[in-house]
């Protein structure tokens, strides 16, 4: 397995052998699903529908960090919160084959949520309030915290050292990145010492699947959905309609508002209305410190910097140039400079 191309050895034969190694009989059906950081596949299981296999990027997370994520999702499922948890085989959710670590999940269907519907926003608020009420019960030991260093300073430094910035744009990008990070720091200072808890971490519409409510238990699971080994805990996601959370791979410690701001869109007035409807549901289960609202544009800025550095760090993975061909273009970095300037203005207004 090459460190530069970490998935070069992850062939279909290896994938099938890995899944069969935990005791499942694959029927040969194999479909790659959209994922770049990890590799995710849907596999057919004889007489049991489908299972989803996530192969973790080598070197990103320690075993302890992955197991903490799995344990958090298991807490949510135990509280009947609709989250898709990894399946356990022989008491373990993290498996290894041929140098690759992987987890298996039941397949969860659904459509994107309609966040322009006030009732949907309130429902999402109630669900995230329940998730955060569980998340605050303990802290991660092996997973990182969302902070300015990890999501801002380090990405800024990496990009400047990467030689991917066009030389003629580097001075302008460096200057506005530094201004943006100064504004982020001021926003965090103004917000004060807000509480950190275990988060989903990447809470946007792509990681929420909406299913229709079902009239009774016997219709709760669509056909061809693998629900796990005999005797295993059934995912709450398999038994109810509404929103279901998937992909806790970016879960970390951070302020509650990190799991909220990506759900809102439109102009400032529209987002304020959406936010209030969301909080109407959220605060039925969890209190919310309004000081965290000062962090929204700061967190958006950190996400912009982190996103560019994420692609840069993965540029040697052949999947990334194919998926993001515009990344090393002049136009991309010009747009980044303009976005950061806009963010500086928004943070100064706030």
What are these regions (language model features)?
Residues 37-53, 86, 182-260:
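Active-site acidic catalytic loop and adjacent metal/ATP-binding pocket
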Residues 45-141:
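ATP-binding pocket architecture of kinase catalytic cores
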């Amino acid at each position: 397995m090459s460190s530069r191309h970490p998935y070069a050895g992850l062939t279909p034969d290896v994938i099938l052998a890995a899944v069969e190694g935990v005791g499942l009989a694959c029927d040969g059906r194999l479909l790659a699903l959209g994922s770049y950081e990890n590799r995710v596949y849907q596999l057919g299981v004889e007489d049991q529908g489908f299972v989803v296999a996530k192969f973790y990027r080598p070197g990103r997370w320690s075993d302890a960090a992955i197991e903490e994520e799995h344990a958090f999702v298991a807490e949510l499922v135990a509280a009947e919160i609709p989250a898709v948890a990894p399946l356990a085989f022989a008491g373990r959710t993290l498996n290894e084959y041929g140098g690759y670590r992987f987890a298996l999940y039941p397949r969860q269907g659904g459509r994107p949520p309609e966040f322009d519907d006030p009732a949907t926003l309130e429902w999402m608020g109630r669900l995230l309030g329940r998730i955060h009420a569980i998340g605050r019960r303990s802290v991660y030991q092996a997973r990182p915290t969302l902070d300015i260093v990890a999501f801002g300073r380090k990405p800024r430094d990496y990009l400047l050292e990467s030689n991917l910035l066009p030389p003629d744009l580097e001075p302008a990008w460096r200057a506005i990145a530094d201004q943006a990070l100064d504004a982020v720091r001021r926003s965090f200072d103004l917000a004060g010492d807000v509480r950190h808890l275990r988060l989903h971490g990447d809470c946007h519409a792509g990681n929420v699947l909406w299913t229709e409510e079902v009239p009774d238990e016997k219709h709760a699971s669509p056909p061809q959905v693998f629900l796990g080994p005999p005797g295993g805990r059934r995912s709450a996601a398999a038994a109810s309609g509404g929103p279901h959370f998937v992909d806790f791979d970016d879960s970390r410690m951070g302020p509650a508002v990190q799991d909220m701001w990506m759900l809102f869109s439109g102009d400032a007035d529209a987002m304020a209305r959406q936010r209030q409807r969301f909080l109407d549901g959220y605060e039925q289960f969890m209190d919310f410190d309004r000081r965290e609202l000062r962090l929204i544009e700061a967190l958006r800025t950190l996400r912009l910097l982190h996103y560019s550095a994420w692609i840069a760090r993965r540029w040697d993975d052949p999947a990334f140039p194919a998926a993001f061909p515009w990344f090393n273009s002049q136009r991309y970095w010009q747009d980044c400079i303009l976005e950061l300037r806009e963010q500086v203005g928004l943070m100064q207004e706030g």
